[in-house]
């Protein structure tokens, strides 16, 4: 009886061990599925259908400049420029409504007069009439671009000279800045022209990159066809 009891107990213990072992094996087979490495889904963006490229001429009587711009854009003469009254009639915008984009274009005569905001001792600003000095306007162009440095991942500037004899500087701003493309052109003696591309959306470098790359070629075309017409 004693031997029989031992055999029965051993068999019972063996059955328990087998049960737990089988349970552990089953759980271990399920663990890879439950604890497999998580892979995040790539964030996608809507596909953008870009128009076929084509250009038309902007050449208005009395304007001191001309250039070519895309046929799928609109040249708009606004009454204000960044909520400021226009200082001369030669400030215009190039709108791309399908992209929610706009190129702001401003013009000043070197040696001419412009209204400037002068900071007072109490922190307020007062309008003041000053002379357009070439060096000051170049400095202002760099300052306006560098205002984006807090959100920009990079700011690069490059000097260019076109076949039409136009010299200027182009700025490329990386990251989630409000503007990724800015430039200015001047003959250093009479004319100063500045442009900046903005989007009417929250800046996102990844989602805007395809549109920015597309519009970069249009900006290049504008610069390469640009001429002074007041000579």
Question: Residue locations for each model-derived region?
Answer:
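Generic short N-terminal amphipathic or hydrophobic helices
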Residues: 2-3, 24
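A short, hydrophobic, proline-anchored segment that marks a local hinge/packing element in signaling
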Residues: 182-188
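Short hydrophobic beta-strand segments that form the core of ligand-binding sensory/regulatory domains
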Residues: 194-198
């Amino acid at each position: 009886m004693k031997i029989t009891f031992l055999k029965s107990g051993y068999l019972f213990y063996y059955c328990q061990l087998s049960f737990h072992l089988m349970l552990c094996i089953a759980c271990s087979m399920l663990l890879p599925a439950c604890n497999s490495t998580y892979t995040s889904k790539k964030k996608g963006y809507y596909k953008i259908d870009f128009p076929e490229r084509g250009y038309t001429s902007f050449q208005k009587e009395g304007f001191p400049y001309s250039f070519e711009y895309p046929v799928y854009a609109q040249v708009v003469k606004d009454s204000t420029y960044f909520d400021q009254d226009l200082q001369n009639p030669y400030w215009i915008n190039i709108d791309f409504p399908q992209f929610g984009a706009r190129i702001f274009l401003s013009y000043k005569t070197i040696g001419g007069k412009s209204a400037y905001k002068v900071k007072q001792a109490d922190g307020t600003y007062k309008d003041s009439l000053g002379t357009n000095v070439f060096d000051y306007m170049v400095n202002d162009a760099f300052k306006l671009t560098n205002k984006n440095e807090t959100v920009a991942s990079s700011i690069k500037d490059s000097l260019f000279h076109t076949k039409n004899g136009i010299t200027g500087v182009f700025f490329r701003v990386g990251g989630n800045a409000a503007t990724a493309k800015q430039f200015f052109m001047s003959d250093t003696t009479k004319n100063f022209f500045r442009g900046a591309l903005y989007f009417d959306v929250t800046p996102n470098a990844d989602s805007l990159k395809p549109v920015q790359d597309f519009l970069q070629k249009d900006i290049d075309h504008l610069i390469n066809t640009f001429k002074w017409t007041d000579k």
